[in-house]
């Protein structure tokens, strides 16, 4: 049936308020790149990236020096998904709901469910993107240990970020409900005189921990590690290298997959390295290369063993500027389409 969308807008706003109280953690933690311009699937959108600055001495002069230059680069992203939820209601259903006096409530709930579905898809998409694009890992995949009495892992994850030069003003950690339950059990967070606020007790919300904004998300999912065993580094790899050559592996169907967490041994005589690296590009070959998202902290030599960490449900910590979410309205033909009404 046809709908008058100007009246529908109010229902959408009401539903948005309800959906905003779902377990949404990634969307409010990332940079939103959105506008009222429309884009087609596959369209490219550029995002400006500033580079490191170089300090210079000050010299007295009668004119402004112009020998310094500053380069602003860009990252090109593309629209690769177009998603929608349809809510067709037949005339018979409409009349029945109207006679019962429940049409507005039922239709509003349908809009809520539609927005919830799209929100959950976006959360899952961001979870996968961040998982496969992370640089380093710590702990066993959860920010909190099984006793719920310590916050060592969240402190260690923050250390990794700030050691890499991450700003400290807008860091977020997105966790699942299990980690959220453990966080709520930490005694000094439950005591207002120690935590500095009573919000976690009175409102059930997660609060900043060590300057990190902790949020829960229904989009956090388990990562199944690849099946590769026995792989060794087969060449010398310097500090900072991201492309690692390997051989001697047994694929076991899945090999090394994007998002896997790996460590390097020192069987070849290299320096021991306890850093946990995240794989950006994996391999299903017995030999070849894998690509890490962050460079090696210690040089590797041939025969150093590659070990995959266990299957886990990863929590993520990142700065807002580390992840950019591009959203545009779908493209429309210049002459319009067959819709009876549009907003």
Feature map (PLM): residue ranges:
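Internal mixed-charge
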Residues: 216-220, 280-343
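Surface-exposed ligand/attachment interfaces on beta-rich extracellular proteins
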Residues: 33-34, 139, 145-152, 246-254, ...
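Residue-level recognition of conserved beta-strand edge/terminus positions
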Residues: 48, 264-266, 309
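Autoprocessing Asn-cyclization modules and mimics
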Residues: 182-301
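N-terminal "assembly arms/tails" that initiate or stabilize quaternary assembly
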Residues: 1-80
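Glycine-centered loop/turn motifs
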Residues: 42, 59-63, 67-71, 236, ...
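Short helix/loop capping segments that flank catalytic or ligand/cofactor-binding pockets
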Residues: 55-58, 87-88, 97, 182-185, ...
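Long, contiguous amphipathic alpha-helices that act as assembly "spine/axial" helices in icosahedral shell
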Residues: 47, 77-153, 162-179, 204-207, ...
């Amino acid at each position: 049936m046809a709908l008058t969308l100007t009246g529908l807008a109010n229902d959408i706003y009401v539903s948005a308020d309800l959906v905003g109280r779902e377990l949404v953690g990634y969307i409010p933690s990332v940079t939103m790149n959105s506008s009222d311009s429309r884009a087609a699937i596959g369209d490219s959108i550029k995002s400006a990236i500033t580079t490191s600055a170089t300090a210079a001495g000050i010299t007295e002069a009668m004119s402004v020096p112009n020998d310094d230059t500053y380069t602003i680069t860009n990252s090109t992203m593309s629209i690769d998904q177009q998603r929608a939820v349809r809510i067709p209601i037949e005339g018979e259903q409409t009349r029945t709901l109207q006679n019962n006096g429940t049409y507005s409530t039922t239709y509003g709930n349908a809009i809520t469910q539609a927005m919830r579905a799209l929100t959950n898809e976006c959360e899952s998409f961001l979870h996968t993107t961040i998982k496969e694009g992370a640089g380093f890992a710590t702990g066993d995949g959860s920010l909190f240990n099984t006793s719920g009495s310590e916050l060592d892992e969240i402190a260690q994850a923050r250390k990794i970020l700030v050691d890499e030069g991450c700003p400290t003003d807008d860091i977020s950690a997105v966790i699942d409900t299990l980690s959220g339950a453990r966080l709520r059990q930490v005694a000094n967070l439950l005591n207002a005189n120690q935590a500095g606020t009573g919000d976690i007790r009175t409102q059930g919300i997660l609060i900043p921990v060590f300057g990190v904004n902790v949020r829960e998300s229904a989009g956090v999912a388990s990562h199944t590690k690849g099946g590769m065993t026995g792989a060794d580094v087969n060449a010398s790899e310097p500090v900072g290298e991201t492309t690692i050559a390997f051989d001697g592996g047994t694929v076991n169907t899945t090999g090394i997959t994007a998002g896997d967490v790996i460590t390097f041994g020192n069987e070849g005589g290299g320096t021991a390295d306890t850093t946990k690296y995240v794989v950006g590009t994996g391999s299903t070959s017995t030999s070849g290369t894998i690509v890490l998202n962050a460079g090696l902290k210690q040089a590797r030599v041939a025969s150093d063993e590659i070990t995959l960490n266990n299957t886990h449900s990863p929590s993520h910590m990142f700065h807002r500027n580390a992840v950019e979410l591009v959203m545009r309205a779908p493209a429309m033909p210049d002459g319009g389409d067959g819709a009876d009404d549009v907003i």
